[in-house]
Amino acid sequence: GVGYKVVVTTTAAADDDDVV
């Protein structure tokens, strides 16, 4: 989703605010 940058540790497509 649209939001602040976060660290994502996944190969799936993640947006800025998608915490995985």
UniProtKB/Swiss-Prot annotation:
Keywords: Antimicrobial, Fungicide. GO terms for biological process: defense response to fungus; killing of cells of another organism. Has antifungal activity against B.cinerea, F.oxysporum and M.arachidicola. Inhibits cell-free translation in rabbit reticulocyte lysate system. Does not have mitogenic and anti-HIV-1 reverse transcriptase activities. This is Arietin.
